[in-house]
Amino acid sequence: MRIELTRSQVGDGESWAEAADRVAADAGSTHRPVLAVDLSGDPLRFQVDDQHTFALRPMTEGDYPDVVRWVNTPHVAKWWDGNRDLEHVADYYGPGLRGEDPVRYWIWEVNGRSVGFCQDYRIADHPEYALLCTRPDAIGFDYVIGEASRVDRGLGTSLLWVFLRDLVVPAYDGASELFAAPDHRNTRSLRVLEKLGATQGLWFDEPNWQGGVDTVVGCSIDVRRVLRWA
């Protein structure tokens, strides 16, 4: 089921997501979640997907082999840092999984099969990054679809929508901004953020594992406008 609504149809005190839920309910579609398709223009486009079930679960050490495989897949590796073998992956993600680091790590599933991973964190907990991106009050997130067969099928938009709406926003009470910063050459990632209603802001240089810098594009999602008004 496809849902389209113009921005003028969004009510006062109502986010785009809430407006889409209202339209879906009026049409009698309440059995499946309403997902973003493309919020970059007007009308806003959503859908109810009867073909896929999207879910997230906490990452565990048992997921490390999949993470290693995903970050070495060509479409991911070109944007990834040096943490590409099992030892480095365990060193990098282990503190978060043990509760020693406030970053939360998740595995994405489509129809019960693991396809990638994502993370969320308070940017203020990472002072050096907060200084670079100038968004200390925002909630940061990063994401990877590791399975090449799942790329360029519109699934990334749906997966991120479920992640941000159902897990990130409820976990950070009062958060008004969600923030991600892909490499400026990563047009695929920039486009998926645009489809989620993100706006591009500051370009800044972020140190990379090779001792140089990567120029990234700060992208912000206004929580009240896009996901949850109250």
What are these regions (language model features)?
Residues 1-47, 60-64, 113-230:
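Acyl-donor (CoA/ACP) binding surface of acyl/acetyltransferases
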Residues 83-105, 110:
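Active-site rim helix/loop that mediates acceptor-substrate recognition in acyltransferases
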Residues 49-51:
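Short glycine-enriched loop/turn motifs at secondary-structure junctions
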Residues 54-69:
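A short beta-loop-alpha structural element at the N-terminal edge
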Residues 69-83:
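Helix-loop element at the rim of GNAT/NAT acetyltransferase active sites that forms part
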Residues 54, 104, 175-178:
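Residue-level recognition of the N-termini of beta-strands and the immediately preceding loop/turn
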Residues 55-58, 107, 218:
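Conserved beta-strand positions that form and line the central face of beta-propeller blades
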